[in-house]
Design a protein with these regions (language model features):
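Short-chain dehydrogenase/reductase
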Residues: 1-76, 80, 84-90, 151-166
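Short, aromatic/basic amphipathic alpha-helical patches
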Residues: 38-46, 124-133
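C-terminal helical subdomain
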Residues: 97, 130-166
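Active-site beta-alpha turn of Rossmann-fold NAD(P)-dependent dehydrogenases/reductases
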Residues: 7, 85, 110-121, 128-132, ...
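Short, well-ordered alpha-helices that flank and scaffold nucleotide-derived cofactor binding pockets
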Residues: 18, 22, 69, 100, ...
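Hydrophobic/aromatic beta-strand patches that form the interior of the parallel beta-sheet core
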Residues: 28, 54, 82, 115-119, ...
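Short, ordered loop/turn segments at secondary-structure junctions
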Residues: 32-34, 121-122, 147-148
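Active-site loop of short-chain dehydrogenase/reductase
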Residues: 76-80, 92-123, 136-141
């Protein structure tokens, strides 16, 4: 699997990154905020797991577009996006941007579909239903999972298991 974890600085992002690395996935970890402390935190995690890393403003359309293209190119395509960024009122906008640009990289015209997982705390605003309907014809599955305050390895493995083919 070639996966992008956007919001890798969150507890859910860290747990999913570790589970993906343990499953030998090729992954890119992206901090959803461009502040220095967050960027360094994700960079340290990336070094430990042996992955790519970036830090962007996840609400900036151009930043998200460029990042998804760079990640897809570096990984040889994208199979999954794990969106874990909790940006408060800006979460829904950032999620929609991430869906739009990663779905393009997963499009069936590129020979594949893909999956987008919104792993957000309960109550975080993200209109998964509308986005799922928009991207389903492109072969992209959207899945929403509640991210607990302190996700563990079992939670992360369960999320990954939901993406496994039947």
């Amino acid at each position: 699997m070639r996966a992008l974890v956007l919001g890798a600085e969150t507890p859910a992002g860290r747990a999913l990154a570790a589970a993906l690395a343990a499953a030998s996935a090729r992954i890119a970890l992206v901090a959803a905020g461009a502040d220095t402390a967050t960027a360094f935190e994700v960079q340290r995690l990336s070094r430990r797991l042996g992955t790519l890393s970036q830090a962007i403003d996840a609400t900036n359309e151009m930043a998200v577009r460029v990042m998804t293209r760079q990640v897809a190119k570096a990984l040889g395509g994208l199979d999954a996006l794990f969106f874990c960024a909790d940006l408060g009122a800006a979460t829904a906008e950032a999620f929609a941007l991430a869906c739009r640009f990663t779905a393009r990289e997963m499009a069936p015209g590129r020979g594949r579909g893909g999956a987008i997982v919104a792993a957000l705390p309960a109550g975080a605003a993200a209109d998964v239903g509308a986005l799922a309907a928009e991207h389903a014809p492109k072969g992209v599955l959207l899945l929403a999972v509640d991210a607990p305050p302190h996700p563990d390895d079992a939670w992360a493995r369960d999320v990954l298991a939901r993406l496994a083919p039947p």
